[in-house]
Amino acid sequence: MLESAQLNKEIYQMRKDELRGGVISAEQFTQIYEEYFDRVYKYIYYRVQNQYEAEDICSQVFEAVISKYDHFSEEKAKFDVWLFAIVRNAVTDYFRKKKKRFHFSLDSITDLILQKPSPEELAIRDDAHQALFHALAKLRDKERNILALKFAASLKNAEIAELIGVSESNIGVVVYRSLKKLQKILETGRFKDE
């Protein structure tokens, strides 16, 4: 146990020494990229609903990881929380620049879900996705963002709470109520109104 703590301390010190010049090693970046790319991309895609924009934002996020890695501190926050703060800020900047609230583009959503569905399956799936996205549009921005962090980015309630700055129980309540609200919207067909 003592050896493990000493080893972690040595690794942390090596990392601090490497970062004095503000440079992340290729191995560190590769490990981060391979471990987090899917979660980051899915969260971004969920929010912007456009494959090409999501890819651009994703590359900006990983560029920011390289340039801001020397600012990361394990004492302040877990790496996941730090990374998704960058991701969330990048998505916010995207919407601010585009001056749009929520845009629906279903041209490539099937790429995230299945490899090669049949035309019939595509038609059924597109209808279901369209209904879901219209129902999601009825939610408040905060609710959509929390659901995206929970389901698209696969963050735990505690990580979302730390990222947003609210209690873990508050996140649980928002997730539960948002899902109930979505269920009610979909069951009543209220998403068809607009």
List where the protein language model places each region.
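Structural recognition of an alpha-helix C-terminal capping motif at a helix-to-coil junction
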Residues: D56-E63, A77-N89
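N-terminal module of bacterial RNA polymerase sigma factors
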Residues: M1-R39, Y46, D70, E194
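Amphipathic, Lys/Arg- and hydrophobic-enriched alpha-helical face
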Residues: Y33-Y52, S67-K68, L136, I185-T188
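Sigma70-family region 2
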Residues: G22, Q49, F62-A77, K97-K98
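Arg/Lys-rich amphipathic alpha helix in sigma70-family domain 2
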Residues: H71, A85-L106
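DNA-recognition helix of helix-turn-helix
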Residues: E143, A152, A158-T188
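Internal acidic/polar
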Residues: A5, I11-Y12, R101-D126, K156
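Short helix-capping/turn signature of helix-turn-helix
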Residues: Y36-D38, R47, K138, A148-L155, ...
